[in-house]
Amino acid sequence: MGHSATDLNETRILLYYCFTPIDDPTAVMLWQRALCEQLELKGRILISKHGINGTVGGSLASCKQYVRRTREFPGFKKMEFKWSAGSADDFPRLSVKVREEIVAFGAPDELKVDENGVIGGGVHLKPEEVNKLVEERGDEVVFFDGRNAMEAEIGKFKNAIVPDVRTTHDFISEIESGKYDDLKDKPVVTYCTGGIRCEILSSLMKNRGFEEVYQIDGGIVRYGEKYGDKGLWEGSLYVFDGRMHMEFSDDAATLGRCRACGHATNDFHNCVNEQCREQILLCEECAADPESATCGRKECAEVAAEMVG
């Protein structure tokens, strides 16, 4: 089948996941790697016995073919793909790996999946159902950020609780800490970029006594596509590729503040210390000055001072 000039010239990024039992993750990994290489796609794909989690970029024609051929695998037949602007150039390389978990919560044996997805997860809400829940229950509804705390610095749901986590691995100890026990009888709406982290987080929360847990179908991406900046979402969305962040309209608020001077910015930069490289919010001016372009740790400040000296 031929491709139109548009399909060959235009590029896209695909974001997708599917929880389904996979008997032979290594075989699926080899198939996916060969498929992406053939279609000249770049990105990152993780496969485990629980399913697949991926983001890839390339020509529109290749992305369309990738979707069609990936859905030929029985467990992936109904998998949803989210399309966004971008290309293979937004990724350094193609990485396809088998892992114990497709999201590293540190609970591979607690997670249970069947052909319908995660067993015992939170109730799925479509974007309009999220707004309806808030209309009906008001301030009783709590938005619970299922991402790393850093991501929420540039965008989050209005009045959301942002747990103190640096990585997904920190979530279990955080929700077991007792800090959020007062939420156990409230409607809690978990949210994350595309929905995958909340599939797992919502089930972990329910297993720990949170009674009324929800998750947003398609995550922030789906909600933002529907409501832009006229709904309950505020600011920019952090993304894990060369774009670093995306906005749903030209009216997006700039929530982030430069770590050094406090000016409004949504741009993350790596700490100037090559051994650290922690991502920090910096305006362009402070990012260009080694003395201000550090995460604040003593050893990083010393490296910066040497660079200036």
Swiss-Prot record:
Pfam families: Rhodanese, Rhodanese_C, UPF0176_N
GO molecular function: oxidoreductase activity, acting on paired donors, with incorporation or reduction of molecular oxygen
Keywords: Oxidoreductase, tRNA processing
One GO biological process term: tRNA modification
Record-linked Gene3D superfamilies: 3.30.70.100, Rhodanese-like domain (3.40.250.10)
Catalytic activity: uridine(34) in tRNA + AH2 + O2 = 5-hydroxyuridine(34) in tRNA + A + H2O
Active site: C192 (cysteine persulfide intermediate)
EC number, as in UniProt: 1.14.-.-
Enzyme class: oxidoreductase
Annotated Rhodanese domain residues: 137-232
InterPro entries: Rhodanese-like_dom, Rhodanese-like_dom_sf, Rhodanese_C, TrhO, TRHO_N
Family: Belongs to the TrhO family.
Its biological purpose: Catalyzes oxygen-dependent 5-hydroxyuridine (ho5U) modification at position 34 in tRNAs.
Name by which UniProt lists this protein: tRNA uridine(34) hydroxylase
Name of the gene encoding the protein in the UniProt record: trhO
